[in-house]
Amino acid sequence: DHEHKTARLSLRQGEILECLNRCCSTELDDIRPDERPTFHPEYGRFMLESTPGKPFGVSVAELLRVEPDMELRRKLARKHLQANEVPMAIVSYPRLGTHDTPFTDPAHVPHGEASHSLFLPDELINKHVRFPTLTANIRKRRGSKVRINVPLFRDVHTPTPFVDPSVPWDRHEFAEDQEAALGAAYTDHIYMDAMGFGMGCCCLQVTFQAPCIDDAKRMYDQFIPLTPLLLAATAASPVYRGYLADVDCRWNVISAAVDDRTLIERGEAPLKEGEPQHNSDSAERRLRKSRYDSVDSYLTTREWNDVPLEMNERVRQRLLESGVDALLAEHMAHLFVRDPLVIFSENINLDDTRSMDHFENIQSTNWQTMRFKPPPHGGHTGWRVEFRSMEIQLTDFENAAFCIFLVLLSRVIMTMPVDFGMPISLVDVNMQRAQRRDAIHSQRFHFRSSRHTSQTQEYTLADIFHGSPGDNTMPGLLPLVHSYLDSLNMSETERQRLNRYLDLVAMRVD
């Protein structure tokens, strides 16, 4: 609204998607049907998810199609918006959950039966029954509303301690309304209490298909140490519920927003006497992380798995008996320590030899920095890995740059003798450092110091991407990518176009 200088979230996802899907199926005559982009519903009614209609190849020409494809999808979305609507590629809407002025169009009061939120109305949740059911079931399984506390950025005018005056401390509509006053809302923090604060965030995800399971496992493992680094390099979400935060990333916000663990599982209530700590087959157990968090184990190198892994022992044993290797069996058994969050009655009794729905029900609600994706039943899709940590950027050029950089890194991993492996515990440390304010300049990250040794050192992000000065054993990610490009046959124009994307990544980490 230019006249009143306000910006709100449009809740017209359903209408816009209907128009887009009709357009993509009937109006794009110049694009083959199997190559037309697709648009999908997401958690928030103010969100659109888009994917290319067809996977890209690995040639230089295919890489240079990434940005035009993103531009096409944005153009299509804009075509079906109203005159006062704009498709914004931002991680989190800065005023989501504020009380002083409406933040959605149309405006709604927060009193929803699914979330019980003090700040967010259920009307911003996708209408499909899956999404409000997810919201309610996380709250019910947990035994309370989710508890999100983001450190507040402090300046000379910030009161000490800061007690948020915008929290409706005296609301008495739902039983959980008193949680904020009873300790759920921390002082000097931005308090949020609903799944929508996390699943209302947007990100940039890239999926790779490998020629075989062994290559997929190698790519998965080599990408794991890079997930915190790319999170820091793409950091783009410093504002929550109208307050400037002391973090720059969404990750811990989403992690807390879907944390369905009970008090006992979170370690906030005692285990029963004699109860094993990591036994998913018992009713009470400890779970170290939310189901939205960083990867917990490698698939190819046990020595880097230095953190105890909670597993569903029956699943692990069944997989081992069926010939699945030990590390992959442990990975899958770890996914199955979680309960399903939504099951539709018509899908309870399925033939698992023909349907993967039961597996995907668990797999798709384990939201980690990487996802290892077995081939679906039927068709020609192979083993895939999904890189999930990056934050969405404002422009198509920026998003294309990080996608292309990641694709080129995947080629480095598969064609050059590199090894980024390091203890998973240090990857977890890096994930927390990556989210701190101005992590590019203020933090140092654990990273392997040489491909000839398993030792790690702490480096700045610039050191890791450009190479450590005076250390020829740690060449840096960007020099490795350029070395790979040097081996390819391409025109000078193509190389210059690729270099523009890599230059953006290089400048971002400086």
Where are the language model's segments positioned?
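Phosphate/nucleotide-binding catalytic core
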Residues: 1-510
